[in-house]
């Protein structure tokens, strides 16, 4: 398995690192994620708000502190993968991707638009 430097990864995987990282400010980013979920759902006029809000803390913790996915190497075969089986929570996934820099605000604003990769339910073809 290819060795990754800490500089190009989202975070360390140790429980201590997760605890230390989340202790700094456990709710600020998750609150921003919730605000994105609500604003994107309102803007698009669709979305499963309850499902997305209920998983916001979990998805933000995974993307913010646990998953090792370099933003510049999304196709790296050795990176972590995330499968969202709770597809109705796609807005939480998309918001996390935006907050971590995987997608732009312009792309986030295409949510549920014609030709967008960001549908109400995530597709397996997304590279993040």
Residue ranges of model-derived segments:
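Alpha-helix N-cap/helix-initiation sites
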Residues: 47-52
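N-terminal hydrophobic or amphipathic helices/low-complexity stretches enriched
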Residues: 2-6, 10-33
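A short, structure-level motif marking secondary-structure boundaries and short turns
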Residues: 22-23, 43-44, 78-79
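Cofactor-binding active-site loop characterized by glycine-rich and histidine/acidic residues
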Residues: 40, 53-128
